[in-house]
Swiss-Prot record:
Similarity field: Belongs to the universal ribosomal protein uS3 family.
Name listed for the protein in its UniProt record: Small ribosomal subunit protein uS3c
Annotated disulfide bonds: none
Molecular functions (GO terms): rRNA binding; structural constituent of ribosome
Localisation: Plastid, Chloroplast
Organism, scientific name: Illicium oligandrum (Star anise)
GO biological process: translation
Subunit note: Part of the 30S ribosomal subunit.
Keywords: Chloroplast, Plastid, Ribonucleoprotein, Ribosomal protein, RNA-binding, rRNA-binding
Cellular-component GO terms for this entry: chloroplast; cytosolic small ribosomal subunit
InterPro entries named in the record: KH_dom-like_a/b, KH_dom_type_2, KH_sf_prok-type, Ribosomal_S3_C_sf, Ribosomal_uS3_bac-typ, Ribosomal_uS3_C, Ribosomal_uS3_CS
Domain KH type-2: from-to ranges: 47-118
Length: 218
């Protein structure tokens, strides 16, 4: 059987960097990870509730977290900031209050910044959300995959592979369907590949979406 390594972990230190930057004592490490998860969940819930169109489409590419002794710096890389109802300044202020309440940390300041992603459809997380939305609306999975590939062409990517697994179209037996366009050299470490795995709940059960995007070669 083929052993599939995570493309992001495989390239750490070469073309990929960590999304979280902080240090902790071994006994406090698990608490730090849980704190990161709380911050991410809180931000995703807030963005979902405050979208102009209540579609469940968040458009968050990634959330970067940097921790110091007295400061937590959170950078949200978002694809479509104009979808948010509140103005940027007021929205960030409200979000900061929400996250601060959730964390319950008195000694540390929280600073949240929103950065717009230049080419949103070159981000696998945003593409996976788009496909998930299509599948929820009962669009044919092949049509959704082909449309996602068309969208990545706008972002000047060199290749993309999309895979959907589970009870596709409500069939009794689960299967895997995939489509590839261009080159996706998974074994080349210098190849800058972005990856995302995403689970979507449909009326037939949970489907898994995996996306690999080949951006460039160093």
């Amino acid at each position: 059987m083929g052993q599939k390594i995570n493309p992001l972990g495989f390239r750490l230190g070469t073309t990929q960097s960590h999304h979280c930057l902080w240090f902790a004592q071994p006994k406090n490490y698990s608490g730090g990870l849980q704190e990161d998860e709380k911050i991410r969940d809180c931000i995703k819930n807030y963005v979902q509730k405050h979208m102009r169109v209540s579609s469940g489409f968040e458009g968050i590419a990634r959330i970067g977290i940097q921790k110091k002794i007295d400061l937590i710096q959170v950078i949200i890389h978002i694809g479509f900031p104009h979808f948010l109802i509140e103005g940027r300044a007021r929205g960030i202020e409200e979000l900061q209050i929400n996250v601060q309440k959730k964390l319950n940390s008195v000694n540390r300041r929280l600073n949240i910044a929103i950065t717009r992603v230049a080419k949103p459809y070159g981000q696998p997380t945003i593409l996976a959300e788009y496909i998930a939305l299509q599948l929820k609306n009962r669009v044919s999975f092949r049509k959704a995959m082909k449309k996602a590939i068309e969208l990545t062409e706008q972002a000047d990517t060199k290749g993309i592979q999309v895979q959907i697994s589970g009870r596709i179209n409500g069939k009794e037996i689960a299967r895997v369907e995939w489509i590839r366009e261009g080159r996706v050299p998974l074994q080349t470490i210098r190849a800058k590949i972005d990856h995302c795995s995403y689970a979507v709940r449909t009326i037939y059960g949970v489907l898994g979406i995996k996306i690999w995007i080949f951006l460039d070669e160093e």
